[in-house]
Amino acid sequence: MSEYLFTSESVSEGHPDKVADQISDSILDAILAQDPNARVACETLCSTGLIVMSGEITTQANVDYMQVARAAVKRIGYNSSDIGFDYNTCAVLTAFNKQSPDIARGVNRTKEEEMDQGAGDQGLMFGYACDETPQLMPMPIYYAHRLMERQAELRKDGRLPWLRPDAKSQVSVRYLDGKPQRIETVVISTQHHPDISHTDLSEAIIEEVIKPVLPKKMLSGETRYLINPTGRFVVGGPMGDCGLTGRKIIVDSYGGTAHHGGGAFSGKDPSKVDRSAAYAGRYVAKNLVAAGIASRCEVQMAYAIGVARPVSLMVDTFGTGKIPDDKIVKLIERHFDLRPRGIIHGLDLLRPIYEKTAAYGHFGRDEPEFSWESTDKAAQLREEAGIEPAETEPLSLQA
């Protein structure tokens, strides 16, 4: 038997790196709403009283970048310098250029040629799914995200009025032979009003944030709760740390359970395969697991700039596949168009849907906009692979 602990973390929408991600994706959404074929690469830095946006944008859209950025910060809840940032008074600087013509010539195509649109860059991307949860996500990252969503909910609806936007979570799960057995440690660090005592804060976080989210059957008397372990977290947000787009790529994906190709998602239009191919990889892996072809599945794709078809495609089912991995590759090639334009069309990615992805994970969420979470190909894949419908359901997340 193999026994081990595995840990994943998440951060709140008010974490400075996530503030930057949300600003970048709010700019992307504002542009796509007017110009779906725009080319956008928006990078954001946020620090004390300052937002800086730069990158490459080629578009016919007319967007007030400063106003869009301020609105994103307002939605997060940074409305006073007392809590680390003020959307109304912060300075906002922009320095955008157009996309390089050397890149554009490999991506732009006529209407007749559009399905052969080349990848916007070289790179490797991974998709992953497993049957640990109904959402077919690894358990540690799934719960870490849900804890941060709960923190934001209680902050925004006023039930815990002393909460502030910046927060982090960490969940450690004990596994036996690859199956989650129990949650051993939960860490939450949350920014707070200076007048709340550590004792009151800890009790409220455990009772109001953690216990309503985590299933009772995964907790025990030995589960450790580490709440604000330093004892104080008043200075936070961009005042506490400089935030940058693309610095939370493991939080954004699978919490370290799966490989990562290194490319960030936020601020990039879907011609950038860092984003669109990672979404496609999740779509492929999730459908394979939903079909019962494997209980764990990781897909790797690689692209060359200006070339439409992936230069490589690899599947690893970690010994859980009902058919050989090389046959699964053939299934993928028959049922999924992994050219950039095929991905964009198949997943309907030219919509202004991206700000919502920029906090609480890009995967494993039941949001109608997240087309890559659909399992619409599972039945067909199952039939072609000759697999009987699964007799067991993934582990329940009901508390």
From Swiss-Prot:
Q: Tell me the Pfam families matching this sequence.
A: S-AdoMet_synt_C, S-AdoMet_synt_M, S-AdoMet_synt_N
| Biochemical pathway | Amino-acid biosynthesis; S-adenosyl-L-methionine biosynthesis; S-adenosyl-L-methionine from L-methionine: step 1/1
Any one Gene Ontology cellular component term annotated for this protein: cytoplasm
Question: What is any one GO biological process for this UniProt entry?
Answer: one-carbon metabolic process
Q: Which cofactor does it need?
A: Mg(2+); K(+)
Entry's InterPro entries?
Answer: ADOMET_SYNTHASE_CS, S-AdoMet_synt_C, S-AdoMet_synt_central, S-AdoMet_synt_N, S-AdoMet_synthetase, S-AdoMet_synthetase_sfam
Task: Read off the Gene3D superfamilies from this record.
Answer: 3.30.300.10
Any one GO molecular function term: methionine adenosyltransferase activity
- Which parts of the sequence bind ATP? H15, D166, A167, K168, R232, F233, D241, R247, K248, A264, K268
Instruction: Give its E.C. classification number.
Output: 2.5.1.6
Where is this protein found?
A: Cytoplasm
CDD domains, sorted: S-AdoMet_synt
Residue ranges for the region (Flexible loop) are 99-109
Q: Which residues bind Mg(2+)?
A: D17
- Kindly list the positions annotated as binding K(+): E43
Keyword Aminoacyl-tRNA synthetase part of the UniProt annotation? no
Entry-linked HAMAP family: S_AdoMet_synth1
Name of this protein: S-adenosylmethionine synthase
Gene name in the database record: metK
